[in-house]
Amino acid sequence: MLLAALLAALVARTTLGADVDAVPAPTFPPPAYPYTESWQLTLTTVPSPFVGPADVYHTRPLEDPCGVVALISDPQVDRLLNEAVAHRRPTYRAHVAWYRIADGCAHLLYFIEYADCDPRQVFGRCRRRTTPMWWTPSADYMFPTEDELGLLMVAPGRFNEGQYRRLVSVDGVNILTDFMVALPEGQECPFARVDQHRTYKFGACWSDDSFKRGVDVMRFLTPFYQQPPHREVVNYWYRKNGRTLPRAHAAATPYAIDPARPSAGSPRPRPRPRPRPRPKPEPAPATPAPPDRLPEPATRDHAAGGRPTPRPPRPETPHRPFAPPAVVPSGWPQPAEPFQPRTPAAPGVSRHRSVIVGTGTAMGALLVGVCVYIFFRLRGAKGYRLLGGPADADELKAQPGP
């Protein structure tokens, strides 16, 4: 019996080895679009994952312990790109980072930065990007989705349970999303990777203060392939173990209830409170138009058995345009006469103007008289001759007397 069991195990191992050797080597596909790849762009340190609240999701449960855990959800990046188009910004900058959250700290998993991106294209279509930086043990069985916003975890181990956080930043606007990963109980994948957080040199867990001081990208993360060749590398390892990656993956669901087995020691996140809808203001009630005449109150006729009878209508009074004069008791001061404004005089010649004209006329006459006097004074007899008299004194003496 023991010999038969050993022979069966040898045959099975030989058959598996033949299948593994038959797996062809991966071929690296070309980039989906042209871009320039560099080691760093603007960020030299990994941004902190503790910058604000996060939306919480939990991944789909695995039916196969060696399946693929999909950390996928829509971060609503299209809204930010449409906003950039509306503000006529020609390009935008972005970066994506993944972390594993523990008690008050975070393990680095993945970081990439984009620049000179076209907001009219899908997210990640940029002219410049950095080389994807990975924590080396995670790159062996994790890789980004095709849109580079999700993360796929192939054949996870029990140590992979817990809380993972994604940070997507577009032009300084941060979008945080938490994913809760829980694996089926009592099932283990035989070829799952082992935990290396404690044995690997750079598997430290960084607090918020450490991120604020600066966690260098090039020192604690390792460059790896871009998304298309990275997927082929992980798929090659998966196929060597007799599996094939599925073409589609189910997205995570919002965190409505606790998972069946939350990670031990991980802080339980709280969903972000949704804003309460503001009550709509009620329209003001319409004010009824005042009636022309108020109804007359009813009176009770005791002689008729107490039944209310309406009062007779009041006689109409003629409209008085003005109130009658007030009656002032004797001995009271009489009201003063109302002020009567003066009637303006008819337009005419001003008295001041008449004085000026008269004075000017007199001065003119005086000036003419002075001029005539001087004229005759200077001319002497000549002037006298002009008036019919002698020219000078000698001629006056020569004239015979009467």
Curated annotation (Swiss-Prot):
One of its GO terms (cellular component) is membrane. The keyword Iron does not apply. It holds the Pfam family Herpes_glycop_D. Residues 293-304 have a biased composition (Basic and acidic residues). It is found in: Virion membrane. Residues 1-17 form the signal peptide. InterPro entries: Herpes_glycop_dom, Ig-like_dom_sf. Residues 269-278 have a biased composition (Basic residues). Residues 282-292 have a biased composition (Pro residues). Residues 238-316 are annotated as: Profusion. Disulfide bonds join 66-189, 105-205, 117-126. This is Envelope glycoprotein D. GO terms for biological process: entry receptor-mediated virion attachment to host cell; symbiont entry into host cell. Keywords: Disulfide bond, Glycoprotein, Host-virus interaction, Membrane, Signal, Transmembrane, Transmembrane helix, Viral attachment to host cell, Viral attachment to host entry receptor, Viral envelope protein, Virion, Virus entry into host cell. Residues 252-350 are annotated as: Disordered.
